[in-house]
Amino acid sequence: MRSDMIKKGLERTPHRALLKATGIPQSQMERPFIGVATSFTDLIPGHVGMRDLERFIEKGIHSGGGYAQFFGIPGVCDGIAMGHKGMHYSLPTRELIADMVESVAEAHRLDGLVLLTNCDKITPGMLMAAARLNIPCIIVTAGPMMSGRGVEGRAYSFVTDTFEAMARYKAGVIDAKELQVCEDNACPGMGSCQGLFTANTMAILTETLGMSLPRCGTALAVSAMKRRIAFASGEKIVELVHNDVKPRDIMTRAAFENAIRVDLALGGSSNTVLHLLAIAREAGVDLPLETFDILAKETPQLASMNPAGKHFMEDLDIAGGVCGVLKQLGDKIIDTRTLFGLTTRQLAASIENVDQEVIRPLSAPVKKEGGIAVLFGSIAPKGAVVKQSGVSDKMMLFEGTARCFDSEELAMAALMEGVIKAGDVVVIRYEGPKGGPGMREMLAPTAALMGLGLGDSVALITDGRFSGGTRGPCIGHVSPEAAEGGPIALIQDGDRILLDIPNRKLDLLVDGATIEARRAQWTAPEPKIKTGWLARYAKVVTSAYTGAVTTAD
């Protein structure tokens, strides 16, 4: 075992002394040392329930014959970090998390890891660490929040009933009393936000990849099932250590294709593009951005999940969960290995009945193409991403007039002041991985568009990214970004822009000579942040089309 390097032999006498100082009995020294990387914090609703899960994981590890050792990992709530300086830090924490897990596991020669996670950047960071370390690992996602319920019985959810409600109030659609009801009911307790936002999409994809146990991706945070999964995961990691089953044995190219297909079938968050690219890179899997679009054209959307649809995570869990989606996708799923022991097709076959109102069959899809599309064109030579599952039919082909803003704050002010009108294309730039820095989510302006009733008449494009809660004609991840001199930096107010999602086009309708003249006049702006972690991050982060990862190159 790896841990023998710190606990066996004469020369390890000091190491054993230090281990015994933590309370480890001599009788436990022969057991596998299992690290539990816990991202518990009472700052985040998705993570406040983890103390209970930690206990069940620990019980499972000891039941399985291992010895549990806990260490902490930070977490950021994107909802709380939204709309201010804090959002600059969200995506960069993904890299920090991967680095921290790697550091602790290597420094202490842990035999295996249980990675307890839930929210947006924590789960991909944990998966990146697992792929990079390639020692036995299992993921436990803490589970989604229940939908809120008001006195009149209707369901409430975070994005629709907070960010969008704020804009509806500003527009006079609802009054202050109704807004307060929304605020009080949108988030009823612990768990990741209720819809198919980034956290829940990543939990589902983790299960699809084979890196968590069945139902882990959808079982609610408050459920007893989640605790049983935590216990079983603790037992399973000891088995994985003994059998030397490693993440790269599971996270193969075929497993990533399955994850993308499930993502597309459910209409998941566009952030998953960034994260899957980054995880695949750590796993040594070649996964070009174009893969998402190739698979989208042959994978129909089978579910209509909140925020664009009516179903919540609790509905998906009851309907059959990830195994139900695999079953409905049928032969489109490749038979791959999972940590659980059964293959993906065996897991699909284990589900007898699927609620076809929630997870439709291939013969009756919600839409004929998957939820995510990759666009190219003169604005995005290296690509841009849109969650087409959240775009109305009317806006799939749209030509509009550019209204340019060099930050999210400027765009948000224009929206709330009524400057943006039907027929406009809001361009938010210098918000990419380098230019932001940190590639902030544009949830506030996109929610404002919907709340103001502009979702069928105004498009938004950015080199930033979007929350999983975003819906509407919102195109992000535009590459190259403005800070690198990408074409998005050269757009001017009044330019005409063509958005053609069916033909995967995003074009600036300005002649080439004019564009080149503008390029000759363009100079890179001064960095927005010049000190601290973000200044270092901006120097080493790559473009969105490669996953916005940090490299030593």
Swiss-Prot record:
Catalyzed reaction equations: (2R)-2,3-dihydroxy-3-methylbutanoate = 3-methyl-2-oxobutanoate + H2O; (2R,3R)-2,3-dihydroxy-3-methylpentanoate = (S)-3-methyl-2-oxopentanoate + H2O
Pathway: Amino-acid biosynthesis; L-isoleucine biosynthesis; L-isoleucine from 2-oxobutanoate: step 3/4; Amino-acid biosynthesis; L-valine biosynthesis; L-valine from pyruvate: step 3/4
PROSITE patterns from the UniProt entry: ILVD_EDD_1, ILVD_EDD_2
Binding-site positions, [2Fe-2S] cluster: C119, C193
Record-listed Mg(2+) binding positions: D78, D120, K121, E441
Enzyme class: lyase
Keywords (A to Z) from UniProt: 2Fe-2S, Amino-acid biosynthesis, Branched-chain amino acid biosynthesis, Iron, Iron-sulfur, Lyase, Magnesium, Metal-binding
A molecular-function term among this protein's GO annotations: dihydroxy-acid dehydratase activity
Purpose of the protein: Functions in the biosynthesis of branched-chain amino acids. Catalyzes the dehydration of (2R,3R)-2,3-dihydroxy-3-methylpentanoate (2,3-dihydroxy-3-methylvalerate) into 2-oxo-3-methylpentanoate (2-oxo-3-methylvalerate) and of (2R)-2,3-dihydroxy-3-methylbutanoate (2,3-dihydroxyisovalerate) into 2-oxo-3-methylbutanoate (2-oxoisovalerate), the penultimate precursor to L-isoleucine and L-valine, respectively.
Name of this protein: Dihydroxy-acid dehydratase
Annotated organism of origin: Trichlorobacter lovleyi (strain ATCC BAA-1151 / DSM 17278 / SZ) (Geobacter lovleyi)
